[in-house]
Amino acid sequence: MDRFLYYPLSLMPYLVITLIVSFTMHELAHAYVAYKFGDDTAKKQGRLTLNPIKHLDPFGTILILVAGFGWARPIPVNRRFFKKPRLAGVLVSIAGPVSNLILAFIGFFLLVLMHAYGMEMLAAFSTGLDQFFSIWIQLNLVLFLFNLLPLPPLDGYRIIEDLVPPGVRAKMTQAESYGFIVFLVLFVTPLGSYVLWPMLNAGRDSILKLFSAIFQPLL
């Protein structure tokens, strides 16, 4: 069975739990910020909820288990409802990745607390909890960094769209049709192994060092 999966079968329960929570919070963050700025499109579609069924894309979720990458159902956003479309657009786009950064921070904090104060009480579960928190932290950091890449249709691309002049934005909108080709090149060719993943891993490690520095007194 392991040969059909990107991750070991023994880690699947931890991975599935992490994906469900991370994808749900990511999309809910988009929906909530859009709603606060006046766009109730997602709310009307039942997306302003913690129910993961409303946010998970079946194919995208399965794909991440077998190929290492995937996606959730994107939140619909209607910019016409925003009084300040560019500002609201940036904040809506960045809300998703920030939610993953917050989840990673919470996971790191709980892991530190467990090792600092609760290891004796949790000794029987320490190995499993270590594995779970490791997956939780690293996957959320990768989601944070990956979604900030300036590639369509990722959040990083949307942020740039709202920061550039209207003329440039129009050209970026036209270029979105090439997004699938870009992702195909990154994930099917060696380019991803030599460029994308080393970059994401370096960013992840830098954030982990920052977390460690923050919690140094407890380590």
From Swiss-Prot:
Cofactor info, note text: Binds 1 zinc ion per subunit.
One GO MF term attached to the UniProt entry: metallopeptidase activity
Enzyme type, top EC level: hydrolase
Topological category with respect to the lipid bilayer: Multi-pass membrane protein
Keywords noted in UniProt: Cell membrane, Hydrolase, Membrane, Metal-binding, Metalloprotease, Protease, Transmembrane, Transmembrane helix, Zinc
Chain positions recorded as Zn(2+) binding sites: 26, 30
GO biological process terms, semicolon-separated: proteolysis
Keyword Cell inner membrane on entry: no
Family: Belongs to the peptidase M50B family.
Protein name in the entry: Putative zinc metalloprotease YwhC
Source species: Bacillus subtilis (strain 168)
